[in-house]
């Protein structure tokens, strides 16, 4: 069974936490992680690109010259695609790039990235993140006490963490999520994970 050190908010060690190997100790599947990251990045795309076809371009209502007798090619509109200033053919339309992978694939990817963080020593467990009011300075002290210098993803329990979330949202390189909302993309993008002990339990309940 994998074990990680358990810390208090002040940075002192409070013991160890034993992790479920079926969640935090598997052999990472990099191919599945890649597929899920691509899927989640695709879901973030706005998809608001658009073009104007010949019916949407302004003007062009009048036939430019009569059908016969001019010696020129017949034309019905100055906004046909072959004209300068004409409509675009087969251009982009607004659409969603999102697509959904099977649940088991997404869960395997989560297990893989969690296991990688544990194996690399980049998962930090903390017994609690308890704040009596939303104070950015107080959360900054926690980050400093735990010697976290680079980008960190803070994983909170699913409920009852409003002050902790508000305290962290104005800090650079700190992103906050919950046990049920943590995504593969967020975890991969972070250098370290700071996970509350109760959130670890909730993660294991879902993924084990």
Curated annotation (Swiss-Prot):
GO biological process, one term: translation
Pfam families: Ribosomal_L4
GO molecular function per UniProt: rRNA binding; structural constituent of ribosome
InterPro entries according to UniProt: Ribosomal_uL4 (IPR002136), Ribosomal_uL4-like (IPR013005), Ribosomal_uL4_dom_sf (IPR023574)
Region (Disordered): 45-89
UniProt keyword terms in alphabetical order: Ribonucleoprotein, Ribosomal protein, RNA-binding, rRNA-binding
This protein's GO CC annotations: ribonucleoprotein complex; ribosome
NCBIfam families: rplD_bact (TIGR03953)
Its job: One of the primary rRNA binding proteins, this protein initially binds near the 5'-end of the 23S rRNA. It is important during the early stages of 50S assembly. It makes multiple contacts with different domains of the 23S rRNA in the assembled 50S subunit and ribosome. Forms part of the polypeptide exit tunnel.
Protein name (record): Large ribosomal subunit protein uL4
Lineage: Bacteria, Bacillati, Bacillota, Bacilli, Lactobacillales
Gene name tied to this protein: rplD
């Amino acid at each position: 069974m994998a074990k990680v050190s358990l810390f208090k908010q002040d940075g002192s060690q409070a013991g160890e936490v034993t992790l479920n190997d079926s969640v935090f100790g598997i052999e990472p599947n990099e191919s599945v992680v890649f597929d899920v990251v691509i899927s989640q990045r695709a879901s973030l795309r706005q998809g608001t690109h658009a073009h104007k076809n010949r019916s949407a371009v302004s003007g062009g209502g009048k036939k430019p010259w009569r059908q016969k007798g001019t010696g020129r090619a017949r034309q019905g509109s100055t906004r046909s695609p072959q004209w300068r200033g004409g409509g675009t053919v087969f251009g982009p339309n607004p659409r969603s790039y999102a697509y959904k992978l099977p649940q088991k694939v997404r869960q395997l990817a989560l297990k893989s990235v969690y296991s990688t963080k544990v194996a690399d020593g980049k998962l930090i467990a903390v017994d609690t993140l308890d704040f009596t009011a939303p104070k950015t300075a107080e959360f900054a002290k926690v980050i400093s006490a735990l010697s976290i210098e680079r980008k960190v993803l803070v994983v909170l329990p699913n409920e009852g963490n409003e002050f902790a979330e508000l305290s962290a949202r104005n800090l650079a390189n700190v992103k906050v999520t919950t046990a049920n909302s943590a995504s593969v993309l967020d975890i991969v993008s972070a250098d370290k994970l700071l996970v509350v002990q109760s959130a670890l339990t909730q993660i294991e309940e879902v993924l084990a």
